[in-house]
Amino acid sequence: MDRIRRTERLAAMTQMLINAPNRSLALSTFCETFDTAKSSASEDLDIIRTALKRFHLGTLETLPGAAGGVRYRPYVEKEDAFAAVNALCERMSAPGRVLPGALLYIADLVGDPAALERMGEILATEYYDVEPDFVLTMEMQGIPLAMMTARALDVPVVIARRSVKAYEGAAVHITNPVGSSFKTMSLPKRLVKEGQKTVIVDDVLRTGGTLSGMRSLMDEFRVTVAGEAVLIATEEAYQADPDVRPLMVMEGVDAATGAAKIRPGDWLRG
């Protein structure tokens, strides 16, 4: 292989780190990949660490011990998180988004990879210290945000469903109230282990029935729920369940314009 210039090595190392969020990479990995000495690789990582911190692009931590290395986390400062969510609030407050029943149209946001990636990083920042074993969500619209959060945390996504297929094996089923009716929630036994920790991520908090059901489901598995977050919550639901971390809060509907009044979750104010 031709001699690798430092600028090339820095660019490639940065990409390797970004592609493996919250994952430990051994120093030897960089030494072998770029055929460089440990001292040179360490200097490169110091340069990357400084740049990430300066431009608020995340953190690069050194992990001690024989199995240690470095770990990149797409950490989002509170002021940056608030600004990003506030921009989404303005987008969601546009006229024409309020549907019959005071529901908010969010399908385009749920399908926006760039916006959801940032939201996932914001939620992951809140739960890095919790060190969950997986992210739990409910089909269907909660899946994209849960997936992005899990990616930033480097953990699997576990999806509760209204029914399970035969090929998924034995499952735990519960029945819980959702709105004005009762619905079944199911989860294959092989996906979760007793004693694990999870963070619940869903799309909307309106009546609280779905979140309550997922809590009950985790109780059946004896799994600790270490955090709960949603994309958007109604003001009433947020006040009733203040431990939930909503990215956005829908305060109501402007009678004059018919547009939703939406603000960032209070926890984002630092």
Where are these regions (language model features)?
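PRPP-dependent phosphoribosyltransferase catalytic core
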Residues: 216-270
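Acidic, divalent-metal-coordinating active-site segment for phosphoryl/phosphodiester hydrolysis
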Residues: 202-212
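Active-site-facing substrate-recognition patch
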Residues: 71-131
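Short glycine-rich phosphate-binding loop at a beta-alpha junction
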Residues: 132-139
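Extreme N-terminal segment that seeds HTH/winged-HTH DNA-binding domains in transcriptional regulators
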Residues: 1-26
